[in-house]
Amino acid sequence: MGISLDNGIRISLSDIFEGDQEHAFATTLHPDGRHEIVDVEPLAEGSTSIWNSATTGRRYPTKWVVSIPMLKARLCVEPFVREQEVVSPIGEHKYEGASSVIGQMQGEPVTGHAIVELVGDWN
């Protein structure tokens, strides 16, 4: 998930599964050029609003609450349109959702936009 906030902060989120282990982290780029890698609460736990693809039968979450404790951030990510699956005739189908972001960071309201990419089985 890539997030661009109106306060100038850019966030790249990763949520990786290895067996039954989930590893979530974010790389942040601040307007002054500072770069940080910080822990994120697991994204799968904050995902809701499951959309079922009529084309592939895949299920994808389409709303997320992103919590980044070190940045004192809680961001709600929701797609502009739910149906944003990329169907591949030769490979893995995936969800690439252009989304809006609204929330709080460091006690201040923030808004922005995001692109969400989901690969794999979300059943």
Give the location of each predicted region.
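Structured soluble/peripheral alpha/beta segments that form catalytic or ligand/cofactor-binding pockets
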Residues: M1-N123
